[in-house]
Amino acid sequence: MTVQQLKYILKVAEVGSITEAAKMLFISQPSLSNSIKETEKEAGITIFHRSRTGITLTKDGAEFLGYARQVIQQMELLEDRYVTNLPGKVTFGVSSQHYTFTENAFVELVKRFGQERYAFYYNETGTHQILDDVKNRVCDLGILYLSHENEIVMRKVIEENHLMFTELFSAKPHVFLQKTHPLASKKVVSVHDLAPYPRLNFVQGEYESVYFSEELFSSIPVDKEIRVNDRGAIVNFMLGLNAYTISSGIFPKYLNGENIISVPLAENETMHIGYVLNENQELSEPGKSYLEELRKYAPANP
């Protein structure tokens, strides 16, 4: 198995077609197909499902791809350091639920480690995708929360994927809404108070479930609901529609002036915000630094 073969497999997985990948790699389709078959035979697994509509990764293939990507990244770092005679690149990646503070902490990380050359990765995505990204080593760690509502199922999924969860801090749920919202003057808001207004939830794709939801109490039926996949859209809908969402309450005011506020939710629940890693994985220095930055956002009185 060669580095070149791994690069071929990464390209095929990226474009989803052996024909298109062969064109981009400037080799013949039969040569590429043979290379993939040789790699599959040597690894003892089937990497791709093949069909008339194209190819997709198998479960074994997705895991293989994660390791292959790591090998290629390490090879590039080796070449950068000893072939080009340039300073080595600092690399680090995070997949996170849609939190402002995780993005802010990432900015501070880049400021600290962003030297002349670096390759950082930050992805806001759905809960299940975070687990996939960490499992397949697309990123170094993932940020998500556990609660009384989702903990049993989430811990089971985390364990099945050979991952481990470590809590960073806990936070009481808050309602995010615009400062002119009819409920903005209340010291505490109940789920009943929110009933007349549109609820905003983040899309979870094929894994739409209360257990993978990024919002607490998403299992409670509502008459008005909007699902989005962009944090900017959520802010716009709060401002334009008197909509709301439920989250941790950590939302720096400078991101939208004084327009968005958070009000404590009366319900008895706690968000345990933490990170997931592969089992037996050691954190890199950028990883340790990133977690330090995240801990700075811990609520004073959760």
State each model region's role.
Residues 160-166, 171, 232-282:
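Beta-alpha-beta core module
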